[in-house]
Amino acid sequence: MAKKSMIAKNKRPAKHSTQAYTRCEKCGRPHSVSRKFKLCRVCFRELAYKGQIPGVVKASW
């Protein structure tokens, strides 16, 4: 879980475009965040297994 101060800081607009970085919308994790879903790999996996992300299915080949 991210610190509340870091989550609040990330919500403010960056002064320069290179300062902006992605954080997970659910838990605030800064690493391994998917841009398409705005979720980290851990939260993405949890929600995908529960079936809460439309169009995402477990791969089988």
Curated annotation (Swiss-Prot):
Membrane-spanning residues: none
PROSITE patterns: RIBOSOMAL_S14
Keyword check for rRNA-binding: yes
Source superkingdom: Bacteria
Any GO CC annotation of this UniProt entry: small ribosomal subunit
GO molecular function terms noted in the UniProt entry: rRNA binding; structural constituent of ribosome; zinc ion binding
Key words of the record: Metal-binding, Ribonucleoprotein, Ribosomal protein, RNA-binding, rRNA-binding, Zinc
Co-factor requirement: Zn(2+)
Binding locations of Zn(2+): 24, 27, 40, 43
Alphabetical list of InterPro entries matching this protein: Ribosomal_uS14, Ribosomal_uS14_bact, Ribosomal_uS14_CS, Ribosomal_uS14_sf
Described function: Binds 16S rRNA, required for the assembly of 30S particles and may also be responsible for determining the conformation of the 16S rRNA at the A site.
Family statement drawn from the similarity comment of this UniProt entry: Belongs to the universal ribosomal protein uS14 family. Zinc-binding uS14 subfamily.
Quaternary assembly: Part of the 30S ribosomal subunit. Contacts proteins S3 and S10.
Protein name: Small ribosomal subunit protein uS14
Species whose genome carries this gene: Streptococcus pyogenes serotype M49 (strain NZ131)
Organism placement in taxonomy: Bacteria, Bacillati, Bacillota, Bacilli, Lactobacillales
